[in-house]
Amino acid sequence: HLDPIDHGMFFESGQATKITCSFPVPGTTNPLSEIERAWREGRAEVDIVPQGTLIERIRSAGAGVPAFYTPTGVGTPVAEGKEHRDFDGRTYLLETALSADYALIRAQKADTRGNLQYTGTSRAFNPAMATAAKVTIVEVDEIVEVGGIDPERVETLSTYVNRIVQREAGDPLP
């Protein structure tokens, strides 16, 4: 059994001061996560976003779309401070694209150019993150020659990958 990754280590070390996420704390029974502690002490800004809105903000950044409207979050604390607009009798919130300086992602396989193939839940956010970041660093289990990934299985093009790091054999997944 592996313990869940607690991203609070980045706040504890001072490497991060803001987090935009759907679930800012690990699924543990610890009394207070480091992210919560940093937020309560004023050392961190926490922006909680519904998961569907979060992935659409990331995808929009990768596609060059600066903003979009969504009905998700209307009438909740998520809507506070955001522009509201009615379309056909329904209220929507304006959400802005979310880009990153760096994306640290994981894939099953990369070819030597950086084309990526994923398995499982890695497909959920990693392809979008690669397109939305200035620099994408990917950790992979295997690096193959160009042509070693079936073209139908390439899920992120090498255009979006800047660095490849191969996981050591036997290294347990986090």
Language-model-detected regions and their locations in the chain:
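Conserved alpha/beta enzyme-core scaffold
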Residues: 1-174
